Amino acid sequence: AAAGRRGGGRVSTKRAGGFTFNHGAQFLTARAPAFVSAAETAIVHAALARWHVAGRDALAGQPTMRDFPDFLQQGLAVRQQTEIATIRHDSDSICLVDKTDETVSARQVIVTAPAPQAARLLQTAAPDLAALAATASYAPCWTAMYGFDAAPPAHNPAPIGDPDGPVGWALWESDRPGGDPSNHALTVQAAPGWSIEHLEDDAADVARTLLLAWQDASGQSVGTPALTSAHRWRYARVV
């Protein structure tokens, strides 16, 4: 079950106004053997592509980040927009109760929510695990998205970012592996410190500020976006 409209959580893609933005995780890395195997299978099926970026060997969803979780959940019965309220033991099974009080029983449960949310879900069924999850600290991330009618100016296709500045990551979507050159979309993710400082700011103010910061950091000058949006990831990364 997933509370969102699509699977993948922070491995996410947004489409709006004819533009496509990979506004969550920008790439994946595979180290654990089981995940390496899954990633290799996804590469064979064109759901992932190798991407050497930001000094690391990474993986990019194809054609978007969201397509990788879509690939993984093929053949599964997935319930979207279903928020689990409680997890509890019931004789020899585990019960999941959603916000409408509908109950589903299972032999095993995997919780992939961010640790603060997982801690609340596991308080009854696995208090020790809940206590461990509660010790995790997360940094938020403001993500701003801009769609333009015109193609971007000439630029270095590498992402830009400064962990100590407002802009932690910024990239034209067309510069991603397999990126559509007609998708004149820019994604800017704020650095953790800036996101913490401005966590409760108005989304429109965040978008305006980050566009100016990106222009200063990149040296690129762009006109008024045809589309502007911002998304706040409250639990973006473990710190």
Explain the meaning of each model-derived region.
Residues 8, 103-157, 220:
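Central helical "cap/lid" subdomain
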Residues 18-22, 34-58, 81, 130, ...:
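A short alpha-helix-loop-beta-strand transition element characteristic
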Residues 145-199, 205-218:
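Active-site substrate-recognition segment that forms the wall
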Residues 80-95:
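A conserved short coil-to-beta-strand element within the FAD-binding core of flavoproteins
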Residues 99-101:
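Glycine-centered tight beta-turn/hairpin loop motif at sheet-sheet or coil-to-beta transitions
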Residues 215-239:
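Flavin (FAD/FMN) cofactor-binding core of flavoprotein oxidoreductases
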Residues 26-35, 48-73, 200-209:
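Short beta-strand to alpha-helix junction loop
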